[in-house]
Amino acid sequence: MRPIDRQIYRPPDFRTTFLQTADTKDKTKLSTGAAEHTPLMKQFFAAKSDYPDLLLFFRMGDFYELFYDDARKAARLLDITLTQRGSSGGAPIPMAGVPVHAYEGYLARLVALGESVAICEQIGDPALAKGLVERKVVRIVTPGTVTDEALLDERRDTLLMAISRSKQGYGLAWADLAGGRFLVNEVDSVDALEAEIARLEPAELLVPDEDNWPEFLRGRVGVRRRPPWLFDADSGRRQLLAFFKLHDLSGFGIDDKPCATAAAGALLGYVEETQKQRLPHLTSIAMEVASEAISMNAATRRHLELDTRVDGDTRNTLLGVLDSTVTPMGGRLLRRWLHRPLRLREVLVQRHHAVGSLIDTGADTDVREAFRALGDLERILTRVALRSARPRDFSTLRDGLALLPKVRTILAPLDSPRLQTLYAELGEHDATAHLLISAVAEQPPLKFSDGGVIATGYDADLDELRRLSTNADQFLIDLEQRERASSGIATLKVGYNRVHGYYIEISKGQAEKAPLHYSRRQTLTNAERYITEELKSFEDKVLSARERSLSREKLLYEGLLDALGGELEGLKRCASALSELDVLAGFAERAQALDWSQPELESAPCLHIERGRHPVVEAVRDQPFEPNDLDLHPDRRMLVITGPNMGGKSTYMRQNALIVLLAHIGSYVPASRAVIGPIDRILTRIGAGDDLARGQSTFMVEMAETSYILHHATPQSLVLMDEIGRGTSTYDGLALADAVARHLAHTNRCYTLFATHYFELTALADASHAGGGSGIANVHLDAVEHGERLVFMHAVKDGPANRSFGLQVAALAGLPKAAVQQARRRLAELEQRGGDSHAAEMAPAALDAPQQFGLFTAPSSAAQEALQALDPDELTPKQALEALYRLKALL
């Protein structure tokens, strides 16, 4: 296997060293660095040469040190001190370091920033080494391959993804090493590829080192370019067969998926290369079927704010309202479900029935209460498989398995088919639970090296060795009393430190009374320390017992790992069942707490929602939420929604999309009733800003997202369109909005919620009725003026709006009174000159005719406009004089 990167590493300061020592006689030796660098630096360069693009944590005693460019980079990223460590090769050595006992925190920060780190450990014992202690890279930590608890977000999957491409499209493979999942997929377009990456959000992405990759991948954190030959379908197939010890891949359903196979092989090769060990927890590979899930592109996920708001905040999102899971593994499963709503009606009906059964029996409360003592078994089992489990992983697993009889008792009487399946998948693990109960201490230490991991009574030999250590305390007390009595020194003490071992301490003033058989061991400022033959013999015996005790514990620990390894598959199924049960119980809790109802999934096309609410807006608002209905069917496929800004148009559209999504993950929904027919896609075009990274304006982003919708929407798609055409001129925007609405209604024939400020579009409904049917109807949200206040009703009513209340909203936003007054005057002038442009007076065909609307005919002069903009009551004398000069200049 080749190293991670292909280039050969050269010490970064070689060229500088050569230039700075021009008077050196043998410049050839300097150019290679072999003759001038210290032995330690040679060892560093040898380790670094295999990992030139990774930060190298180089173990030196109690610190991991970084040198040269690594030190500079780490100092900048971690805000640690950049210093120097002498010189080597004729130049100072830049150095930065982190303490070994706290390195995981620094490592987590680097991984979160997309960095990869090679850990170079001291292999030999420094006390026994002659010359340099041996060092070796024993571990590579990359953003997509971490499995340590301290480096992971407990409620989010950490994924490694590989992408291959062919003439037919793209192959994707991704693995959750911390959870033991390995999946593949194939997509046929760049848009579909972007949608999958947006759904999965991989921490690290492997791609062939080639040109012409999609623009959205450029500059993305965590992208690793790899040699193209690693993404070969044939070699990938051989690698998968060897890894899983199989003769063919038909059991995984990927025999006819060469592009996905190529990606999977590249991913597996990278994992084996970086982890430097077997991966027994990856026992299969699954093929995702795109047709089984509702499709949502990146824009839709962003607009609906599933787990992250448009501004990047993770609060007040759908996941924030919905997530009532108790365990981290349940939280991760819920996030996966939320980002991949299913179209499989039977699966969803079973989930809904399970939630209902938990509610009706009150079992959800019992399950959630039991789960409060349940840890993250999924990730613990991964660490068991990788033999990196820590002492408290064993105790957490023990306590989790001890809960199983209680959970099984709760589920046994329930009549839900899905809950009974989960009951069976929990399995019976009494023997494993008993093993851990008898073998693991009640409260084990954090680190294995502290000892005390194995319970007393589990192993007789270990108990005997511990007794030697335990009895040592009493021996030392007795020895101290005897020595005080025999020497006559009342202040004599017996103690121990790690450097000098056991000792007898006598103060300087009493040192002359020390018996002749005392041998001086250490001299302090105020005391002398001694050793006796008896104490030396005891020391050898006790220290030997402690070393042997730790060795015995390690042997027993390895035996526990072996025993658990044989039960791994059943335990993984159990953890998976517990995760799903946690999610379903959370759904039940949310349904009761938030007054949600069970949706009805129909095979006939329809979308009927009664008294629907927006789950997030309702949760964060103090006042009651105004519920609204939605009724779409083959003869009523599009609603043109008009009304004032802030009136609730966007909220109404989003809430219906979220209700559909919630129904398709198995949750109850915020409505009194929801009847939902087949849905294959949710597509949205809601709000936008400039995409500066791609050099796209607001209008360009709007048109790109609209184009995607027009090309992909089907009669089973739900489409939300908000204010199409507002990013350009009035006429262009109106023409585009009209064309898009007609295309969606006549060509795509999808379910569409179309919010607009162009009242002219409300005439489309009249044309629909007159022409016999493109299924367009008008609805509106209204507001009422109460004195100087504007009260938004938030109720959706049939028919078009008669006012937009734009000026009133502007006043609410705090526009200067003069600007609002000028706007009112200008509006009156435009309405007088252009006539009433209400849609009821405008023929639908007008949009097809090559004419202007007369909106801005006979423009006023610049001087008139400037004069109308002035508010004399708000001008100072100086401002009034300046305004007069400006007006004169315009004449």
From Swiss-Prot:
Secretion signal, residue range per the UniProt entry: none
Source species of the chain: Xanthomonas campestris pv. campestris (strain ATCC 33913 / DSM 3586 / NCPPB 528 / LMG 568 / P 25)
Top-rank taxon, per record: Bacteria
Entry GO CC: cytosol
Stored PROSITE patterns: DNA_MISMATCH_REPAIR_2
Protein task: This protein is involved in the repair of mismatches in DNA. It is possible that it carries out the mismatch recognition step. This protein has a weak ATPase activity.
UniProt GO molecular function: ATP binding; ATP-dependent DNA damage sensor activity; damaged DNA binding; mismatched DNA binding
Entry's Gene Ontology BP terms: mismatch repair
Ribosomal protein in keyword set: no
PANTHER family to which the protein is assigned, alphabetical: DNA MISMATCH REPAIR PROTEIN MSH1, MITOCHONDRIAL (PTHR11361:SF34), DNA MISMATCH REPAIR PROTEIN MUTS FAMILY MEMBER (PTHR11361)
Keywords associated with the record: ATP-binding, DNA damage, DNA repair, DNA-binding, Nucleotide-binding
InterPro entries reported for this sequence: DNA_mismatch_repair_MutS, DNA_mismatch_repair_MutS-lik_N, DNA_mismatch_repair_MutS/MSH, DNA_mismatch_repair_MutS_C, DNA_mismatch_repair_MutS_clamp, DNA_mismatch_repair_MutS_core, DNA_mismatch_repair_MutS_N, DNA_mismatch_repair_MutS_sf
Binding site for ATP: 643-650
Name of the protein in its database record: DNA mismatch repair protein MutS
Family: Belongs to the DNA mismatch repair MutS family.
